[in-house]
Amino acid sequence: MEKINDKMAKLTIKRLSPEEEFPDLSQHNNHMAKVLTQDMYTKLRDRATPNGFTIDGVIQTGIDNPGHPFIMTVGCVAGDEETYEVFKELLDPIIEDRHGGYKPTDKHKTDLNPDNLKGGDDLDPNYVISSRVRTGRSIRGFCLPPHCSRGERRGVEKMSVEALDSLSGDLKGKYYALKNMTDAEQQQLIDDHFLFDKPVSPLLLASGMARDWPDGRGIWHNDTKTFLVWVNEEDHLRVISMQKGGNMKEVFNRFCTGLTKIETLFKDKGTSFMWNEHLGYVLTCPSNLGTGLRAGVHVKIPNISKHAKFEEVLKRLRLQKRGTGGVDTAAVGGTFDISNADRLGFSEVELVQMVVDGVKLLVEMEKKLEKGQSIDDLMPAQK
């Protein structure tokens, strides 16, 4: 028995040479595969963050998921706050590529003052079905979902629920742990677009974020279900403000108020969110760095969405389209989820402004096409 214990103490990860371990990325279309070379892999392979996260943990999801039909995926994740520094040779070029030339020396800006948003309360409700703003936050001192332990995940849940239970007024609400829900209750919340999906997404599974499901996961929402917080899905926290119709101003107002209150409640508990002046708010996926903000509307645009210039219009407006049910879905009945393409290098107010102005223009184009008119005079300049 002593011999076995002695052997266990000396156990190290058995790996072959970097050449033999380097993944085959020849069929891949994601940001990680564009950047990672064998030389870089060799250089980064023997590094680990203080929590033991390695380059193989960073890239696994991008190896297992070569590409995506709708969007160019990032193909990597962070396991902790230090990942972005320890593996910066890989992650800096990916961040620059994904975030429109954002340089390693650039500094991020934050603006959560809803008074700085112009308009936004007048999107046409005949076209705009619902409006939503979300972001993610990571709690300092814990590993991120791809690498956290069961105990850490439960610690994040406990701390979050204690903070959220202190919210009052129209933000007052209740926490619902996933493990206490029936399948029918879960499915109803998913169908109503309130809850994250069951862990079927290959991006979630391959990165290790679905371990121990549903332990430590849940949803907190206010009584009217217009302010929600997801706990321990892709990020420690996803903060969401949403409602039916086109009043993005109201949605953003609630978002800023609630988010600021939550941050204060965490500070009162002696902890803070992961943030630095270069990357802004640090989150699991490099695509969400900076603001972590996605302002989206479900909008009925059956005509413009079939137009030859639709993709070009979106690109110029710095907008992204998704299917009706989110990132892995197709559009139903010409209804698309239209949101800001950027997260980093722009402030929260600037991103919501782009969505408000851009969606207004898309609705204007849709109305012209309904009448059989040309939209050439409405073509926007590149933002």
From Swiss-Prot:
Region of interest (Disordered), ranges: 99-119
InterPro entries per record: ATP-guanido_PTrfase (IPR000749), ATP-guanido_PTrfase_AS (IPR022415), ATP-guanido_PTrfase_cat (IPR022414), ATP-guanido_PTrfase_N (IPR022413), ATP-guanido_PTrfase_N_sf (IPR036802), Gln_synth/guanido_kin_cat_dom (IPR014746)
Catalytic activity: creatine + ATP = N-phosphocreatine + ADP + H(+)
A matching Pfam family: ATP-gua_PtransN
Disulfide links within the chain: none
Binding site for ATP: 130-134, 193, 238, 294, 322-327, 337
Phosphagen kinase C-terminal domain sequence ranges: 127-369
Coiled-coil parts of chain: none
Single Gene Ontology MF annotation: creatine kinase activity
A cellular-component GO term for this protein: extracellular space
PROSITE patterns: PHOSPHAGEN_KINASE, PHOSPHAGEN_KINASE_C, PHOSPHAGEN_KINASE_N
Tissues where the protein occurs: Exists in many tissues, but preferentially in testis.
GO biological processes: phosphocreatine biosynthetic process
Biased composition (Basic and acidic residues): 99-112
Annotated function: Reversibly catalyzes the transfer of phosphate between ATP and various phosphogens (e.g. creatine phosphate). Creatine kinase isoenzymes play a central role in energy transduction in tissues with large, fluctuating energy demands, such as skeletal muscle, heart, brain and spermatozoa.
Protein name: Creatine kinase, testis isozyme
Organism this protein belongs to: Oncorhynchus mykiss (Rainbow trout)
